[in-house]
């Protein structure tokens, strides 16, 4: 089943590690309690940040290949989060002061039931933090997160309607810079609901703007394909950095290929990207290049970190960035 053997490891990037520490600061604004549950805790990196701040840490994640790592310093159940799995926590009702779900909500086929399970394990004075990673998707012409693992996308208004049906309240909506800009919805069991003061952020989502967004996406894909194909036809080496799901989505939608892709995660090395069959190699491969190369940061939300890593290995580089528009950036 999906996510049982999961190759995405959140602790791979320094950008995320720093953000996880910052996220603890966000949580601390709302909660004095110190018992936290991380839903879809992956390798436990976010829980590490909570543990450093004195929290009692719990997690749940179905990835069997990551369980030894995530449970090393935390109480982690290897399972999907649902009404059956929460029974595995002792005294699960009203147990946790903090419940977090970062970039997992879109994976769920039953979001109302997901929230209702969160409500069961959340303490009466606690807060639930739902992070979604598409806050600037339309304004920045981002379409690389639209793929089979992401079942739904929520505006502030649609999230408000869903939250109400689950018997919860929106206390705050925070925009953070991570993953190309994300929303963090701060929810609780008690009112009042403060969502109305944030609804103006949805003003961009008009039918006209959405049609323009679709045209922009098609244009970016075509322009990127044209640039890369032209460079490769001239004999240049064009590689990708980051064998991320969003990068693979962009490649397959845009219909281009690359000489190879490098990734920081050893679990992906010497595999191939789905559909395009591009080899995935260790980052050190870049050191072996003896001529000018072009690098496409496929985890574009980590552009600055990727640029710094590549520059430390090879300075004879031009970067091809595609959001919000296509541009070539010299090292």
Describe each PLM feature range.
Residues 130-152, 156-158:
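Short, glycine-/aromatic-enriched active-site segment of Class I SAM-dependent methyltransferases
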Residues 112-127:
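A short glycine-rich, Lys/Arg-flanked "PGG" loop and its adjoining helix->strand segment in the class I
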Residues 100:
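A conserved beta-strand element that flanks and buttresses the S-adenosyl-L-methionine
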Residues 72-88, 280:
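Conserved SAM-binding strand-loop segment of SAM-dependent methyltransferases
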Residues 125-133, 318-324:
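Conserved beta-strand signature within the Rossmann-like core of class I S-adenosyl-L-methionine
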Residues 168-179:
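Conserved S-adenosyl-L-methionine
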Residues 26-27, 33, 49, 188-331:
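Hydrophobic, well-ordered beta-alpha structural blocks that scaffold small-molecule cofactor pockets
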Residues 1-69, 142, 147, 152, ...:
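Extended interfacial segments that mediate partner engagement and assembly in macromolecular machines
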